[in-house]
Amino acid sequence: MSRVCDICGKKPTTGNNVSHAHNKTRKVWYPNLQKVRALHKGKVQAIKVCTRCLRSGAVTKAI
């Protein structure tokens, strides 16, 4: 699946843009995903990881 973190499963969320006149239009917020070569399930793979997982140390980067 695209736009989903392979570690925590974070995915896009939806909501509304609300103007000053209180008009509403649909909006999608995407997670900040990075492609990283990492040790995942015992193999070195290129996975999509959100920056929160990268910063917290949930990912072991491959060299």
Curated annotation (Swiss-Prot):
Pfam families: Ribosomal_L28. NCBIfam families: L28. The keyword DNA-binding does not apply. GO terms for biological process: translation. Belongs to the bacterial ribosomal protein bL28 family. InterPro entries: Bacterial_rp_bL28, Ribosomal_bL28, Ribosomal_bL28/bL31-like_sf, Ribosomal_bL28_bact-type, Ribosomal_bL28_sf. One of its GO terms (molecular function) is structural constituent of ribosome. The gene is rpmB. Keywords: Ribonucleoprotein, Ribosomal protein. One of its GO terms (cellular component) is ribonucleoprotein complex. It comes from Syntrophotalea carbinolica (strain DSM 2380 / NBRC 103641 / GraBd1). It comes from the Bacteria. This is Large ribosomal subunit protein bL28.
